[in-house]
Amino acid sequence: GREVSVLSFVDGKTIRIMTSAQDHKRAKDGDQGLNTGGMGTFSPSPFYTEEVDEFCKKYIYQATVDAMKAEGREFKGIIFFGLMLTEKGPRVLEYNARFGDPETQVVLPRMKNDIVEVFEACVDGTLDQITLEFEDNAAVCVVLASAGYPLAYEKGLPIEGLDTFKDKDSYFVFHAGTKFNEEGTIVTNGGRVL
């Protein structure tokens, strides 16, 4: 089946689902090459239908929060649901207590809410008073990786062209495997760079 990622905010008792995303894990075009931490993603996923959403809300999302609380593990924060869409319905592949990368890069820019208010509601246990809203558009993220990733790759190579994105609305450059060198130039410092 298809994999879909869904991020959520949790305050210990209430869960608020963000919009869906779908990432591409293979290092090369055409779903070829080794698995990676993610080479790109888009949101929303066309495979995360209203029917899938209803199923997950009924059997997965709130049930997860309730089960954690029942076990004495009340959770506040972010839950990332890695789902597999099968003929028998959605199945949970993984849970992560963090934002997903690169899924977050296409989900949060579409969110209309003030994220600080949402985080405060998670901490205060008032998430039930928040309704998440998202732009009615799509977002795409393409990861720029060092040659050779996910195996061997060079570090310390200068990155050029970042000024191209200054003053561009709705364009973002998210840094991952980068750093400033001794001269103050942004250089590569990992496999998934931007």
Task: Briefly describe each language-model feature range.
Residues 8, 85, 144-145, 175:
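Hydrophobic side chains in beta-strands
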Residues 170-194:
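Internal helix-turn-beta structural module
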Residues 41-44, 142-143, 193-194:
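Short, well-ordered beta-strand elements within core beta-sheets of diverse protein domains
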Residues 87, 134-136, 166-167, 186-192:
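A structural signal for short secondary-structure junctions
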Residues 57-79, 96-168, 176, 181:
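Active-site "cap" helix and flanking loop/linker of ATP-utilizing ligase/carboxylase catalytic domains
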Residues 1-107:
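Internal nucleotide-binding/catalytic subdomain
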Residues 17, 167-171:
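Hydrophobic alpha-helical transmembrane segments
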Residues 39-42, 159-162, 173:
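Short clusters of hydrophobic/aromatic residues that line enzyme substrate/ligand-binding pockets
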